[in-house]
């Protein structure tokens, strides 16, 4: 049994994903649209992702002292992934999404993980943008999240500090108000961050214009609020 056959069995026979089209949000979809998404992702994974496994052995990423140099195949794969619409597949039509059931989106994205997990960082961007869509301001959604969904920007994980791990109450990074007018910033209060963070996947690269880092930090106000954790969105512009 091929991977596609296994995936279709799990999706349609076990999870009964077709039944989701009876819900109002997914009423525009059919088995045919679900299959079309699977077809597209399977093709991109085969043509753009799978060859990367050999290429990366020959053209290893490197740091030239100023920037990270990646194989050209990295750019081509990420461009194809963004063009497919999978970064925003489950989002509302109004923000450029397909209103695809997340079950189908996750199944389709598994083709990329199977083909080359080392290049499959698009899920980090989607997760980053999803966080902003839930907790961000309207302007933050417009400036950050929508540009991530389009592939113009990329995003990283919301990671902790080397000594803290998952114990967020132990982080030591502080968010210090940046000037007396720090709350006047249209995109949200502006802070200076003091501390360290663990940058992991997609932390520095060239394929996108900006990288959005969600950075947890404590906001020093009063002793009673010392344990309050805020989340700052950092925009990093990369030199081409």
Task: Give residue spans per PLM region.
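Residues in well-ordered beta-strands of folded domains
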Residues: 12, 90, 109, 158-160, ...
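Internal maturation/activation junctions in enzymes
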Residues: 61, 124-125, 136-189
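Short, well-ordered loop/turn and helix-capping segments at boundaries between secondary-structure elements
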Residues: 16-17, 114, 133-138, 150, ...
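Amphipathic, small/basic residue-rich leader segments at the start of a protein or domain
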Residues: 1-119, 139, 143
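FAD-binding core of FAD-dependent oxidoreductases
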Residues: 91, 96-99, 103-106, 112-130, ...
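Short, well-ordered loop/turn elements at secondary-structure boundaries
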Residues: 39, 76, 82-86, 149-153, ...
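Short secondary-structure boundary/capping segments
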Residues: 104-107, 136-137, 171-174, 207-209
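A short core secondary-structure module
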Residues: 189-240
């Amino acid at each position: 049994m091929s991977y596609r056959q296994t995936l279709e069995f799990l999706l349609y026979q076990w999870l009964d994903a077709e039944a989701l089209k009876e819900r109002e949000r997914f009423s525009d979809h059919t088995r045919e649209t679900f299959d079309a998404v699977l077809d597209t992702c399977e093709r991109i994974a085969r043509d753009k992702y799978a060859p990367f496994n050999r290429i990366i052995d020959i053209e290893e990423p490197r740091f030239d002292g100023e920037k990270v140099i990646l194989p050209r195949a990295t750019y081509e794969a990420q461009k194809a992934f963004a063009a497919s619409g999978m970064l925003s597949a489950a989002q509302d039509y109004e923000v450029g999404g397909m209103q695809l059931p997340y079950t189908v989106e996750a199944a389709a994205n598994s083709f990329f993980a199977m083909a080359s997990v080392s290049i499959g960082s698009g899920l980090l961007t989607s997760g980053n943008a999803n966080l902003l869509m839930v907790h961000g301001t309207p302007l933050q959604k417009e400036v950050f999240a929508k540009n991530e969904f389009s592939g113009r920007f990329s995003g990283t994980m919301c990671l902790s500090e080397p000594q803290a791990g998952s114990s967020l109450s132990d982080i030591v990074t502080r968010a210090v108000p940046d000037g007396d007018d720090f709350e006047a910033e249209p995109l949200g209060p502006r802070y200076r961050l003091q501390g360290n963070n663990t940058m992991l996947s997609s932390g520095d690269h060239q394929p996108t214009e900006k990288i959005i880092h969600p950075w947890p930090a404590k906001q020093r106000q009063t002793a009673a609020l010392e344990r309050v954790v805020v989340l700052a969105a950092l925009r990093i512009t990369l030199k081409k």
